[in-house]
Regions:
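A basic- and aromatic-enriched beta-loop-alpha substructure that forms the phosphate/nucleotide-
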Residues: 66-74
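Phosphate-coordinating loops and pocket residues in cytosolic domains that bind phosphorylated ligands
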Residues: 45, 83, 160
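Helix-loop-strand module that forms the ligand-binding subsite of alpha/beta enzymes
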Residues: 76-80, 90-98, 102
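N-terminal G-site of the GST-like fold
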Residues: 1-66, 89, 121-125
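GST-like fold's C-terminal all-alpha helical module
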Residues: 96-165
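Short clusters of hydrophobic/aromatic residues that line enzyme substrate/ligand-binding pockets
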Residues: 43, 80-82, 147-148
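Short, polar/flexible loop-turn hinges at active-site or ligand-entry regions and domain interfaces
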Residues: 76-85, 116-123
Length: 165
């Protein structure tokens, strides 16, 4: 199993965190982001979106960190990280969607402005979205205690963690 990634990518980080917790060996293939390797023809053959992470599993390529987390959890984590009960799964998945929406389009993009200087004209919007994301996380944790879903660690925490930490 190969993970095409960068160390600065929160989406790459969340996959690496779960793989580490589950003691899954992954070959990390570091992509040279600064030299735009992610836009090279060879990389675009793996992911036409030109983004990391990309995971190669037995010759099949998947280019979304949520897909990676689901695969790792279902193949190596039993019921612990992503339960098969439909209601429990829905509770976890809503927070995984939240991570790919409010967290990503707020906290991740605000981080991109502050660290990389990307799209500084949009910073206030990203900051506003970040506040909304943090307010929703705070609201949920006030209700549930230490965990976003099911009263225990799940993929919900792994999905949100990189940009909230």
């Amino acid at each position: 199993m190969k993970l095409y990634m960068t160390t600065m990518s929160g989406n790459s980080f969340k996959v690496r965190v779960l793989a580490s917790i589950l003691d899954i060996p992954i070959e990390e293939v570091h992509i040279d982001w600064d030299n735009r390797e992610h836009k090279s023809p060879a990389f675009l053959d793996r992911n036409p979106r030109g983004q990391v992470p990309v995971m190669d599993i037995e010759g099949r390529t998947f280019w979304d960190s949520t897909a990676h987390l689901v695969y790792l959890a279902r193949t190596h984590g039993g019921e612990d990280w992503l339960p098969s009960d439909p209601l429990d799964m829905a509770e976890v998945m809503q927070w995984m969607s939240f991570a790919q929406d409010e967290v990503q389009f707020g906290l991740m993009w605000a981080r991109g402005v502050t660290i990389y200087g990307r799209r500084p004209e949009s910073f206030q919007g990203y900051l506003d979205d970040s506040h909304t994301a943090l307010e929703l996380l705070t609201w949920q944790l006030r209700k549930t205690g230490d965990w976003l879903a099911l009263g225990r660690p799940t993929l919900a925490e792994i999905a949100c963690y990189p940009y909230v930490k």
